């Protein structure tokens, strides 16, 4: 291990042999950090926090602090982080609450940019991008490959679907369907498929066509959700992506952005 002399690492913390802890960082007693992870200057990792392999934790990052929730009574709740993530300067990630999931989870290969905030009980998938100052309320769920622009604010309990894109400065208070492009605030609006993102991830022409047809029926036909789903099942060639979209919309508790 490479631990700077000014860093404070509790003797009970569990660190892999090649972990790097830079100047003035603080590592608490219930922290576990996997191989190849680097913790930058002035970072604080506390609480019951487990961080996987090859993560980059930059300066002034704060992970594992108590949730900003009035119900919290110092229970043993957790942060679980996967592998190959980047947490840029001043990112904050709070641990879960007992009345929530008990654990805030961040998957693998995510890029969380400067001053972003992940609140208690959030569930972040893999390959997610959160640009500078994007902030999540408690209990937010983000699917794989979703992207949030700068200064996006997401209301608690919102779900953000896989491969969706949210434009900078947007305020999100309803669910964002997978594969879609959403921009704006009060209200945010749906602007069609995230076509550029889907093409970058090599979605086939057939899948793109099926998603476009499904989008038009779900959100631009004037039909209610049940009738739109029935129409899609008759008129659109089925595929896993369309099934995921229909399941997401059908299971929404907050309603979806249109």
UniProtKB/Swiss-Prot annotation:
Belongs to the transferase hexapeptide repeat family. LpxA subfamily. InterPro entries: Acetyltransf_C, Acetyltransf_C_sf, Hexapep, Hexapep_transf_CS, Lipid_A_LpxA, Trimer_LpxA-like_sf. It comes from the Bacteria. GO terms for biological process: lipid A biosynthetic process. It catalyses: a (3R)-hydroxyacyl-[ACP] + UDP-N-acetyl-alpha-D-glucosamine = a UDP-3-O-[(3R)-3-hydroxyacyl]-N-acetyl-alpha-D-glucosamine + holo-[ACP]. Pathway: Glycolipid biosynthesis; lipid IV(A) biosynthesis; lipid IV(A) from (3R)-3-hydroxytetradecanoyl-[acyl-carrier-protein] and UDP-N-acetyl-alpha-D-glucosamine: step 1/6. The keyword Lipid biosynthesis applies. PROSITE patterns: HEXAPEP_TRANSFERASES (PS00101). It is found in: Cytoplasm. GO terms for molecular function: acyl-[acyl-carrier-protein]-UDP-N-acetylglucosamine O-acyltransferase activity. One of its GO terms (cellular component) is cytoplasm. It comes from Syntrophobacter fumaroxidans (strain DSM 10017 / MPOB). Homotrimer. This is Acyl-[acyl-carrier-protein]--UDP-N-acetylglucosamine O-acyltransferase. PANTHER family: ACYL-[ACYL-CARRIER-PROTEIN]--UDP-N-ACETYLGLUCOSAMINE O-ACYLTRANSFERASE (PTHR43480), ACYL-[ACYL-CARRIER-PROTEIN]--UDP-N-ACETYLGLUCOSAMINE O-ACYLTRANSFERASE, MITOCHONDRIAL-RELATED (PTHR43480:SF1). Its main location: cytoplasm. Signal peptide: none annotated. Keywords: Acyltransferase, Cytoplasm, Lipid A biosynthesis, Lipid biosynthesis, Lipid metabolism, Repeat, Transferase. The keyword Transcription does not apply. Its EC number is 2.3.1.129. It is an enzyme of class 2 (transferase). Involved in the biosynthesis of lipid A, a phosphorylated glycolipid that anchors the lipopolysaccharide to the outer membrane of the cell. The lineage of its organism: Bacteria, Pseudomonadati, Thermodesulfobacteriota, Syntrophobacteria, Syntrophobacterales. It holds the Pfam family Hexapep.
